Amino acid sequence: MTVTAKTAARALLPNGLRDVLPPDAAFEVATVERLVSVFAANGYERVKTPLIEFEEGLLTGASRATAGQTFRVMDPITQRMMGLRADITIQVARLAASRLAKAPRPLRLTYSGQVLRVKGTQLRPERQFTQAGIELIGAGGVDAIAESVLLTVEALAQAGLPRVTVDLNCPPLVPALCRALGLSEDLAGELRKLLEQKDFTAAAALAGDAAGALSALSGTVGPAERALPVLAALDLPGEAAGHRDALLALARKVMTAAPEVDVTVDPLEHKGFEYYTGCSFALFAQGARGELGRGGEYPGDLNGTVEPCCGATLYMDAVLDGMVRPAPAPRVLVASTLARTTRRALQADGWVTVPALTAEAGAAEARRLGCGHVLDDEGRPVAV
């Protein structure tokens, strides 16, 4: 088939959107299913949420952090504003606080689906992509977060990504330290940006008398084996010390349970973790663009109901970037009149059977349709 300029123009998609073609689409579906199957085998029950819902339900409480990434449309039936989900976590939290409010806690849920965002990023230009993840509702603290970390790492390994780096963070640590030092919210915000950028010289100059306490944090970023002793030795005030101790406990628990995993620590990281209220984490792998996913502890709140929650979300575009594509299943061209039992037997042996809708089912037609085999007179696949 010849593609004309007019056809090509009609196929042009907006920035950040793309078609996924064979065999990549099948590989993504299979990988998502492997991940969610591991989650389900560990007690996480599957849920499915709508792509679009009323704005007030989608952007409530901590989920307001995603408001800037949410497409909005007017519902022509109710005349109410609706939002296209930019993240599934907030929808699962809504389910837990409403339709599953009476379910016993801790409530373990798993999900997968497409999300759409207003803008991409430099590392992730895609605006539409698949998420898969877990949410642990009604449980917080180190043990719950460690469960999220370790199960996500295990699922990635079973899906084909055995070498993963876990970067452990604590978004509330720096704000707690700034409050203890008596810094204004505006100054604390500026310092947080500089510390995220690892511009410790500028942060010290801006902090004034508080420079010493903040500068000490510079040695707490990096491989856990080196950073943890430095972090443990810091003399921090009450609330900040509590966050630090939680991060230390989480790191030690993950390192003990999964010694094969590379663990790094960055208590200064905050960007993208705006609605997390405890320890958080990000996942990386060699060959993948940016983060594979992230997670942590956050408040599940809806209509005044607040309960501790934690979980993890994987970004499938990044996960697939880091994986080696498997060899495609062998394809065999078969006559459209082939007995159903014979076709099923071939498929059970791992063959993809492609029906020949014309009388010609020979080698030339097989090659044209991307089949490496045809059936011989005895019904056995032979290479062409």
Swiss-Prot record:
GO terms for biological process: histidyl-tRNA aminoacylation; L-histidine biosynthetic process. It is found in: Cytoplasm. Pathway: Amino-acid biosynthesis; L-histidine biosynthesis; L-histidine from 5-phospho-alpha-D-ribose 1-diphosphate: step 1/9. Keywords: Amino-acid biosynthesis, Cytoplasm, Histidine biosynthesis. It comes from the Bacteria. GO terms for molecular function: histidine-tRNA ligase activity. Pfam families: tRNA-synt_His. One of its GO terms (cellular component) is cytoplasm. The keyword Glycoprotein does not apply. Required for the first step of histidine biosynthesis. May allow the feedback regulation of ATP phosphoribosyltransferase activity by histidine. This function is generally fulfilled by the C-terminal part of HisG, which is missing in some bacteria such as this one. Heteromultimer composed of HisG and HisZ subunits. Belongs to the class-II aminoacyl-tRNA synthetase family. HisZ subfamily. This is ATP phosphoribosyltransferase regulatory subunit. It comes from Rhodospirillum rubrum (strain ATCC 11170 / ATH 1.1.1 / DSM 467 / LMG 4362 / NCIMB 8255 / S1). The lineage of its organism: Bacteria, Pseudomonadati, Pseudomonadota, Alphaproteobacteria, Rhodospirillales. The gene is hisZ.
